[in-house]
Amino acid sequence: MVLMVEGISKDYREFHLRDVTFSVEKGEHFIILGPSGAGKTVLLEVIAGIIEPDSGRIFLNGEDITDLPPEKRGLAYIPQNYALFPNMSVFDNIAFGLKVRKVPKAEIGRKVRELSEVLGISHLLKRKPKTLSGGEMQRVAIARALAVEPELLLLDEPFANLDVQTRGRLINEMKRWRKELGFTALHVTHSFEEAVSLGDRVGVMLNGRLVQVGPVREVFSRPASEEVAKFLGFENIVEGLAEGRILRANGLVIELPIEASGRIRVGIRPEDIVLSDEPLKSSMRNTFQAEVQADVEELGELGPRTRKAKGRWSGAFSIRYPLFGAGAGA
């Protein structure tokens, strides 16, 4: 493994990290996913050596780097604002770390040209950062970080300052860059899109704790707790008594995909629910007729407005798995 974080805790202003432990494998794109205020950036800055932890250790390729200064850690950190040097050209920004390391001039030129070609910024090398778009600044920051061939690239909300169109395009390009350049990345974000599109594994951070770590598909389909499930979008939590593959809840008999027993709670994703005002033919396991009453938000000329909607509907939903409770199956 490239990075091992063991038991990191830190009280920093209003942020609190609590016993954070995880590892990043070579060539992996590891995502720390959490809401604003969860402590994601503080964790990244502790790993980078900008903030000193209160307890815990950090290892890079088996070496304890906890007490090393940032420049001795073999890491490259890209903050959310990219931190380009405004008085330098794009070429000199990318070359900065190489010049500090006294790399020969010819090698610097070769490296800058190679990276700028892969990242699509060859035409920008003579320009200053103030003339660049957000997407262009991000590419320059990534090139500058990768120029020094770090063991690990630390990315702090790398797409947060970009418009939706640019963000979608650069997320796709990030996949290509990693394939072509072969870097290892630790990436913090609040975006589900980034986690699903880029992550090999994801760690969910809530209130300063890393509460679940695993492959992206596994974490999103099998959250380890109700807290994680709600963060990941399981808005409908139903509690009832399970016996085998049957859950009895609120007068309903619900079929489960696996066996369970005792009192449990299950989560139903909004996208797993289908409504129809006609009799519904569906392969979904659970079909009911019910009356739906809801507030429906419409976007009008003067902004959003809310009206009441009421009617009888046929509905169907599937439950992918029981979520929580002593009787929940594995």
UniProtKB/Swiss-Prot annotation:
GO cellular component: plasma membrane
Catalysed reactions, semicolon-separated: tungstate(in) + ATP + H2O = tungstate(out) + ADP + phosphate + H(+)
Localization in the cell: Cell membrane
InterPro entries: AAA+_ATPase, ABC_SmlMolc_Importer, ABC_transporter-like_ATP-bd, ABC_transporter-like_CS, Mo/tungstate-bd_C_term_dom, Molybdate/tungstate_ABC-ATPase, P-loop_NTPase
Keyword Cell membrane recorded: yes
Alphabetically ordered keywords of this record: ATP-binding, Cell membrane, Membrane, Molybdenum, Nucleotide-binding, Translocase, Transport
GO molecular function: ABC-type tungstate transporter activity; ATP binding; ATP hydrolysis activity
Ranges for domain ABC transporter: 3-232
One Pfam family linked to the record: ABC_tran
Assembly notes: The complex is composed of two ATP-binding proteins (WtpC), two transmembrane proteins (WtpB) and a solute-binding protein (WtpA).
Designated name of the protein: Molybdate/tungstate import ATP-binding protein WtpC
Organism (species): Thermococcus kodakarensis (strain ATCC BAA-918 / JCM 12380 / KOD1)
Record lineage: Archaea, Methanobacteriati, Methanobacteriota, Thermococci, Thermococcales
